[in-house]
């Protein structure tokens, strides 16, 4: 497998073509951003931590029967992935009230949600990722009704698997976002699962161990990511 030209450069990852038209290289960079790119910093080792963390989580999900784009980890900061036809919506599940849900609905942060809530958001930085519903998604041709149901099914299956995994490590999976795409006609989990795209709290102290440390200026971002990885048994060094 040969890495070739850059296909896309996002806020924290770069995607490269390879000599296989069905495979891409996903590079995790040290760039860290928040508020649709308004706040950006470089954090040492973050790319390495997120790449290894993502490989660990995706492998656990594959073991649970959830198809993902991940093929293999190539280096400290790069992974080989399938080239998915991405669906331009984010699937968000919330187990505990935090973030935009608190701001939108005026509920107390930390309130446990039973059942968990599910929301769709359009991936569009210029519009600040607006919330959309199933009717929007079908009307604008972003996904079919069948694909929507499959994304919801897989998103909740991820919740079952990861809530238990994190709970065993003394962590509370507050919320997370997932992105899906199509490969050979099958819906698969794409993008990443790292502390950049979920909220994780210490189950006892409620200490935040995710990107909210960056958003809220709490410091110790990579240290928190390392702590989560250590509790899960992710080998970093």
Swiss-Prot record:
Identify the pathway: Purine metabolism; IMP biosynthesis via de novo pathway; 5-amino-1-(5-phospho-D-ribosyl)imidazole-4-carboxamide from 5-amino-1-(5-phospho-D-ribosyl)imidazole-4-carboxylate: step 1/2
State a single Gene Ontology molecular function: ATP binding
Q: What class of enzyme is it?
A: ligase
Keywords assigned by UniProt? ATP-binding, Ligase, Nucleotide-binding, Purine biosynthesis
An example of a Pfam family matching this protein is: SAICAR_synt
What GO cellular-component annotations does this UniProt entry give? cytosol
Q: Which GO terms describe its biological process?
A: 'de novo' IMP biosynthetic process; cobalamin biosynthetic process
Q: Which reaction does it catalyse?
A: 5-amino-1-(5-phospho-D-ribosyl)imidazole-4-carboxylate + L-aspartate + ATP = (2S)-2-[5-amino-1-(5-phospho-beta-D-ribosyl)imidazole-4-carboxamido]succinate + ADP + phosphate + 2 H(+)
Q: Which top-rank group of organisms is this from?
A: Bacteria
CDD domains according to UniProt:
SAICAR_synt_PurC
Coiled coil segments of this chain: none
EC code: 6.3.2.6
Fetch the HAMAP family from UniProt: SAICAR_synth
Family of this protein: Belongs to the SAICAR synthetase family.
Q: What is this protein called?
A: Phosphoribosylaminoimidazole-succinocarboxamide synthase
Species in which this protein is naturally found: Idiomarina loihiensis (strain ATCC BAA-735 / DSM 15497 / L2-TR)
């Amino acid at each position: 497998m040969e890495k070739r030209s850059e296909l896309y450069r996002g806020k924290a990852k770069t995607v490269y073509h390879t000599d296989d038209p069905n495979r891409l290289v996903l590079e995790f960079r040290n760039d860290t951003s928040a508020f649709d790119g308004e706040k950006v910093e470089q954090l040492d080792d973050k790319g390495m931590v997120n790449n290894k963390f993502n490989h660990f989580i995706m492998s656990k999900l594959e073991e649970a029967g959830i198809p993902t784009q991940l093929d293999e980890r190539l280096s400290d900061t790069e992974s080989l992935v399938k080239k998915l036809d991405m669906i331009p919506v984010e699937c968000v599940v919330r187990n505990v009230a935090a973030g935009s849900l608190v701001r939108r609905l005026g509920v107390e942060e930390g309130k446990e949600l039973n059942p968990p809530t599910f929301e769709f958001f359009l991936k569009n930085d210029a519009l600040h990722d607006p919330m959309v519903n199933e009717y929007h998604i079908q009307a604008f041709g972003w996904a079919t009704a069948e694909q929507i149901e499959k994304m919801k099914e897989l998103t909740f299956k991820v919740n079952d698997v990861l809530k238990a995994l994190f709970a065993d490590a003394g962590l509370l999976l507050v919320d997370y976002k997932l992105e899906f795409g199509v490969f050979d006609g099958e819906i698969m989990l794409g993008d990443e699962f790292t502390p950049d795209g979920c909220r994780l709290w210490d189950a006892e102290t409620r200490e935040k161990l995710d990107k909210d440390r960056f958003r809220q200026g709490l410091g110790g971002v990579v240290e928190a990511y390392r702590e989560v990885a250590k509790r899960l048994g992710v080998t970093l060094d």
